[in-house]
Amino acid sequence: MLRPEQMSKVSVAGSTHVLTPVIEAVHDAELVHLSDYDGGIDGFDNGDPMTGADEAAEKLVTVRSLKSLLDVSEGDAGPTRIVTDDALDTELESIRVEATDLDDRRSELTDDLRAVIERIDAAEPFADLGIDLDLLSGYDSLQVAVGTGDQSAIDAALAASDRISAFETFTGQDTIGVFAYPAADDDAALDDALVGVPFTRLDVPDADGSPEQYVSELRERRDTIQAEIEDVDDELAAFRDEHAGFLLAAEERLAIDVQKSEAPLQFASTSHAFVAEGWLPTSEYDAFTDAIESAVGDHVLVEELERADYKPTGHDQHVPADDGADAATDGGTTASFDETDSPPVIQDNPGPVSSFESLTEVINRPQYTEIDPTVVLFLTFPAFYGFMIGDLGYGVLYALLGFWLSRSFDSEMISKLGGVAMWAGGFTALFGVLYGEVFGLHLVTEYLWHGALGLADAPLKKGLHVSAFAELWLAASLVFGIAHLAIGYVFGFVNESRSHGLKDAALESGGQLLLMAGVGVWLFSTHMQSGGGPRPELLYSVVALPPIVGKAGLAAAVVGLVLVTLGEGAAGFLESPTYALVNTVSYTRIAAVLLAKAGMAYVVNLLVFGAYETHLEHPETIDYMFGLFSTTIEHETHFMLFSGEAHGEVLFPGLMHMGAAGILIGVLVLLVGHALVLALGVTSAGLQALRLEYVEFFNKFYEGGGEKYNPFGYTRNYTTED
């Protein structure tokens, strides 16, 4: 789980006359992640595409263009089929011609519709004016302007102009028509008179008669075109339904053909021989050699060149294979393409853990040579999240949301995130049972822990009403941080020791680990604490280590500081407080979010149901955490769920007990309030948990940048060869 699946580099060499069957066999095996040839073998060049590659690529472009034109989706697929060469020549061309014709018709109609709509928009102001269109132009001496603006300003400007001898304005609801006689033979008299006046001129449509009739005719034309477009859309839909299955199958067939025909571009080739190299899982090597030998017999040489080690030395270090699969050859070579060729990464995680690969890949896929942190994410992220939310009701909803995501989308990433949500919801529900809460109400406590099991209270409390738990969780958050960071530093130590040696690992992660762990141990010890020391007493609610352990912690911290300073110089010394304590303190956000979410749910329920507080006459000591933790309770808070009757000091009477209007408002507050708490659980608890993973944990060891395993081959969904 902490390492990717081991990979082997293989070579397939042979004569060019068996190139085609070898490519077919490698493609069908779908095991080899091909390496690109970079010209490193004397006498060998990159191969050329096989015959028909260009034609297949052109047809593939055509098919994908038709899929886009017809809006074909995976849901339109029919039964699997065999796509013949004849079908790719004749049926595809027939579909292209008819689909293009339909698309051209639709484009023409769309252009016509756009033009008609523009003419309607231009003519509607004239219909508002109500003057026949042929009366708005064509005069020798009368000048006309139609537009929108301020009529009083227009009248004033025309009256003041000595270039206008007479004028009259006509108005509709929004449109103004201006008719004016110039004082002399002055073609620009009206235009000049309107300069500076709030007036936007409109072009008169090239039409005669009533503008209302003209607009009506245009609208009829618009409706006709829209109906024709709908008819073409129906034809396109029917055409898509008829041919979608073929297009999907043709795309798959052509994609496979292009993939196979362009494969030699990655090979080393001469006119007589070829060499192909790539990576496959070591466990699949025997199956691969059997597949090749079954296809071409002893006409190729298949060799396991090396098995990739997990120890990098500058570039990835590879170790020779234990043995090779010998076969005869017609004249090839097994020289390596590129000594720095890194193996692709197959993360080797079991089913439940694999969902959390989606969180790892948000940063990057792990390198082949570094530890895969996915299993730690699986163990810690749901626990952090569930601990901070801790509610049975919210947990069930998160789990249902995750189940829906995992089953409703084809995306592998979304499906994996759904798995993460289910685990987070499960832990939220688990902690909710331990806290005794469902949607912030203590019903689990009342009916399970107190009613069925006879306990005085739930095993855990969030600290909102039992303040001792607030201090406990604050201290426990530091312990969580120390443990989490220690794992990160150990991973970093392992990675660095394998890549740079033990000395560098000790000066880097080793020093930081000793510094952080040493200070952490001292914090929880009683060294220098007698009579009230420098540390808050709340730390000892988790653990109180003896002074001798504290002294050992300080000694380890000093050693760590020396190692960090030797490794990083003055910068390391200046950053030592961060290594020692700052990163650890960052984990107190766990307790902070826990209290914040509990407080939000409490406020919602307080407003809706109301609550009262009872002060105990005799404070009661209650055992929590199944006897591991005890505290004294002096008061209790109870929600008034089923009646407004209070047996103590009323904190708020509750909307549900304020009549019909209060009930309606209360239901609204209940639904909206808990929906908000549910959503903020993702944006606060979720993001804070991710921050601890990515910023605090990953930064101690993780680089990422591994290449995804992408074997040469194709998983058929729409075609069959049988």
Curated annotation (Swiss-Prot):
It is found in: Cell membrane. Residues 309-321 have a biased composition (Basic and acidic residues). Residues 309-352 are annotated as: Disordered. The chain crosses the membrane at residues 384-404, 419-439, 474-494, 505-525, 554-574, 590-610, 639-659, 662-682. Keywords: Cell membrane, Hydrogen ion transport, Ion transport, Membrane, Transmembrane, Transmembrane helix, Transport. InterPro entries: V-ATPase_116kDa_su (IPR002490). Residues 326-335 have a biased composition (Low complexity). It is a multi-pass membrane protein. One of its GO terms (biological process) is vacuolar acidification. Gene3D superfamilies: 1.20.1460.20, 3.30.70.2170, 3.30.70.2750. Pfam families: V_ATPase_I. GO terms for molecular function: ATPase binding; proton-transporting ATPase activity, rotational mechanism. GO terms for cellular component: plasma membrane; proton-transporting V-type ATPase, V0 domain; vacuolar proton-transporting V-type ATPase complex. Belongs to the V-ATPase 116 kDa subunit family. Component of the A-type ATP synthase that produces ATP from ADP in the presence of a proton gradient across the membrane. Has multiple subunits with at least A(3), B(3), C, D, E, F, H, I and proteolipid K(x). This is A-type ATP synthase subunit I. The gene is atpI.
